[in-house]
Amino acid sequence: MSARPPLRAAVVGAGRMGMVHGHLLQVHPETELVGFVDRDTSLAEHLASQGLRAPLYPSVAALYAAAPPDAVFVCTPTHTHLAVVRECLARRVHLFVEKPLATSRADAEAILRLATDAGVTHAAGYVYAHLPVVQAAHDLVAAGALGELLRFTAHAYVSEVFGPKKGWFFQKEQAGGGVVANMASHVLFILGWYFGAIRRLVASTRSHFSTVDDSAQVLFTFANGVTGLLDTSWSVPGTQMLDYGLAVDGRNGTLVLRRERILLHLLAPAAGHDAGWSEIHASDLPADTAFDVSPHIGGEAFYRQLQSFVDACRTGVLPFCSLAEACNTQRMIEAIYASAAAGAPVDA
């Protein structure tokens, strides 16, 4: 148990992701869940039935008057993020915003400016980047194990959409898009974290069942010269959990990242690894997670994400998943949709 006072945190938005973050904040030894905010106050009974003990307030102002937090987690529909962030920053609170950051690059950059001007710690909810295997693969790439980076292939698939869908999540104006904005953005964040800013891309999207994009193919050129292809769909049968992967080629070898392991082939020894094939399994990596909310889907990443945010709030040093990095992801999302609409490459 930490000797430091807990980070007092509130959750704005009492939907699915709001409840996920609420549970984490309630049980983490360094945080205290002080309240939820949602205009639908009838949700209080549902929250209580799920074991969430914090009170529900009808507005941010009501929360601040009754139980002022140190940090706020924004888990409302994407199109509301900018307005909610502006309201939350009426007082100085640290800021966590669920992904995607906004429905447009302009709104995402406005959110970043608000947080920067307020001088608060900030982070975005790209949780898969917190998986130990994803972080270990990043460290190998950053350490130069592969030598000069050349190209990559990536994918993100899940079995979710096989017919008409209703709700804000499937309305482009409210969700910002379909599979690209709301699922593949996890992989886009990882690509940006590994390779930096993009220079140009060309994309195609298709709507098979819903009114938003259900699949997409994207060819990237990054500013550092790395090129690669992303294929994604949430209409792939037989994939109940998100299946993501990344293969990176460099002049000194190849790295293949999957959910539970890294396969590494080096032409010459580098970064503490011998030449030839080696495997790094998730179980080989340091276990620094106090709890795992859902082991079968890599739930340890949620704990690590929260711990990263708490540490950043304590130290004032922004985490790698800051809103600035999320804006890089938003630039990719917007460029993908622009290219698909134009049927032509887009400079980003």
Predicted regions and their residues:
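Predominantly a Rossmann-like dinucleotide-binding segment in NAD(P)-dependent oxidoreductases
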Residues: 128-210, 219, 343
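N-terminal Rossmann-like dinucleotide-binding module
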Residues: 1-51
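Beta-loop-alpha module in the N-terminal Rossmann-like domain of NAD(P)-dependent dehydrogenases
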Residues: 21, 54-114, 301
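Contiguous beta-strand/loop segments that form the cofactor/metal-binding neighborhood of enzyme cores
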Residues: 189-265, 303-316
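Hydrophobic residues in well-ordered beta-strands that form the structural core
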Residues: 97, 122-124, 257
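C-terminal glycine/acidic-rich active-site capping loop/insertion
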Residues: 127, 222, 245-247, 251-324, ...
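C-terminal capping/lid region of NAD(P)-dependent oxidoreductase domains
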Residues: 4, 120, 147-150, 338-348
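Rossmann-fold dehydrogenase core element
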Residues: 109-128, 147-152
